From Swiss-Prot:
Cited InterPro entries: His_Pase_superF_clade-1, His_PPase_superfam, PG/BPGM_mutase_AS, Phosphogly_mut1
Gene that produces this protein: gpmA
EC number assigned by the record: 5.4.2.11
Annotated keywords: Gluconeogenesis, Glycolysis, Isomerase
CDD domains named in the record: HP_PGM_like
Annotated site (Transition state stabilizer): 182
Binding site for substrate: 8-15, 21-22, 60, 87-90, 98, 114-115, 183-184
MF terms (GO), sorted A to Z: phosphoglycerate mutase activity
Species of provenance: Borrelia turicatae (strain 91E135)
Protein name: 2,3-bisphosphoglycerate-dependent phosphoglycerate mutase
Job description of the protein: Catalyzes the interconversion of 2-phosphoglycerate and 3-phosphoglycerate.
Cysteine-cysteine disulfides: none
Active site residues according to the UniProt entry: 9, 87
Pfam families: His_Phos_1
Pathway(s) this gene product operates in, as recorded in its UniProt entry: Carbohydrate degradation; glycolysis; pyruvate from D-glyceraldehyde 3-phosphate: step 3/5
C-alpha cells in the first residue's frame, strides 16, 4: 500500500478578498500562513515524512509547501515544480470578486463557470497583460499550450499526464510523496483517482491547508481517503469554499 498526501495551499490574499485568482501569483494571507503551519503540525503529529514533493510554479502553493516541510524538518527534500499543477486559469474572470460576479451574472452561471466540467469562462485576449504568454516563468512552454481560459476538463488534460509521467512514477518507486497545489488542479487529480463523474466533481470542495491522505493499492487505485485534523474545522472549511461563489 502507498500513501499520497495532497494539500491545497493556505488562504491567499485574493481568497480572503473572494476574488477569482487562477494563474495570478498571489501571496498567502496571514490566515493562510497559519493554515499551512497547522497542516505541517498535524502531519508531524501523525508521523508523516516525505521523500519528494511536487508543486505548481505559483508562490501560494510553494510557500505552503515550504512552511509544511519546515514544520516537518524536511526542507532538504527534492521539490519539483510544474505549471501543469497550476490552478485552473479563470480567463477574464481573474481579479473579479466572486460574489459581485454572482450578483451581475447570477449564481447559477458563476457556479457553472467555477465548477462545471467543460464550460470555461470568457477568455483573456493575448494582448492582455494577465495572459501567461507575457509571464517570463512560462517562456520555455510552447505558446499553444498556455491557456487564455480553462474549464476543469482542460485542467484534467494537463494535470493527468504530469501525474502519470512524474508523480505516479515516484510513488511506484517507493517514494513518499506530498503535492501542494490548488483547488482545481487537486480536484482534477481527485476526479481521476476516484473515477468521479462530471456531475459529482461539481460538488467537491477541497479546503485550504488541510492535508488530504490517499491510501493507494499497488496499481495506484484508491483504497480510502481522509483529511487529517479536527473534524469540525474541516467541515467548516469545506462549507466556506462552497459559499465563495454566492451572492452577498
Amino acid at each position: 500500500m502507498y500513501k499520497l498526501v495532497l494539500v491545497r495551499h493556505g488562504e491567499s490574499e485574493w481568497n480572503k478578498e473572494n476574488l477569482f485568482t487562477g494563474w495570478t501569483d498571489v501571496k498567502l494571507s496571514e490566515k493562510g500562513i497559519s493554515e499551512a503551519l497547522e497542516g505541517g503540525r498535524v502531519l508531524k503529529q501523525e508521523g508523516y515524512s516525505f521523500d519528494i514533493a511536487f508543486s505548481s510554479v505559483l508562490v501560494r502553493a510553494n510557500d505552503t509547501l515550504n512552511i509544511i516541510l519546515r514544520e516537518l524538518g524536511q526542507s532538504y527534500i527534492d521539490v519539483e515544480k510544474s505549471w501543469r499543477l497550476n490552478e485552473r486559469h479563470y480567463g477574464a474572470l481573474q481579479g473579479l470578486n466572486k460574489a459581485e460576479t454572482a450578483e451581475k451574472y447570477g449564481e447559477d452561471k458563476v457556479l457553472m463557470w467555477r465548477r462545471s466540467y467543460d464550460i470555461p469562462p470568457m477568455p483573456l485576449e493575448e494582448s492582455d497583460k494577465r495572459h501567461p504568454i507575457h509571464d517570463l516563468r512560462y517562456r520555455g512552454i510552447p505558446k499553444s499550450e498556455l491557456p487564455s481560459t480553462e474549464c476543469l476538463k482542460d485542467t484534467v488534460a494537463r494535470v493527468i499526464p504530469y501525474w502519470t509521467d512524474k508523480i505516479a512514477r515516484a510513488i511506484i518507486e517507493g517514494k513518499k510523496v506530498i503535492i501542494a497545489a490548488h483547488g482545481n488542479s487537486l480536484r482534477a487529480l481527485v476526479k481521476y483517482l476516484d473515477n468521479m463523474s462530471d456531475d459529482d466533481i461539481l460538488k467537491l470542495n477541497i479546503p485550504t491547508g488541510i492535508p488530504l491522505v490517499y491510501e493507494l493499492d499497488r496499481d495506484l487505485r484508491p483504497i480510502k481517503h481522509y483529511y487529517l485534523g479536527d473534524e469540525d474545522k474541516i467541515k467548516a472549511a469545506m462549507e466556506s469554499v462552497a459559499n465563495q461563489g454566492k451572492k452577498k
